[in-house]
Amino acid sequence: PAPPGPPGRARRPDPERRDRIIDACLDVIAEHGVEGTSHRRVAAAADVPLGSMTYHFAGMDDLLREAFGRFTREAAAQFERRMGDARTPEEAVQAVTTLITHDVFATQRDLVLSHELYTLAARDPAYRTLTNDWMRRSRAALGRHFDPATCRVLDAFIEGMTIHRALDTEPHAAVAVRGAGRRLPRGGPPAPSPPR
């Protein structure tokens, strides 16, 4: 059922309203930050009645979790697709380079959303479930081509280089990333665990 509307006015079915609110919440966060995100702003961005906010979500924290959950799932899926397409050690290294230069934080919006989530996770351990799951999926995707120790280093390398690329004002940033990519260890089957 939809939230009640004004008396005498027919209610239109809107099965996608909840999804639109979640997407609009991410847009509002990207523009105003978490601190500037309110029910009123999100409702206006989603073009829904204000009452829809509390109908579909228990509160702003509930909405933020849903929105950032969607963002991290989509980011992890892109990471998995890129690494999954690699078939050789050389392609795995190229995939890492492409993740940095094209996929992760590909837009200013993605950069802002990521850092807003990091700030929340630093303050509220509950949000670390989202960031930890994101890291787990990223390392699992890398693990198709690299051993566990290398995966942890590469995950941090991708994160750090991506932030530097996104914030760098010099146009040669992408060239520098590609040069660093050529220094990465060659991919290959993960090393077997040592005997216990």
Question: Residue spans of the language-model regions?
Answer:
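Short, basic, alpha-helical segments at the C-terminal edge of helix-turn-helix-like DNA-binding modules
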Residues: 69-75
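Amphipathic alpha-helical segments used for helix-helix packing
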Residues: 101, 105-131
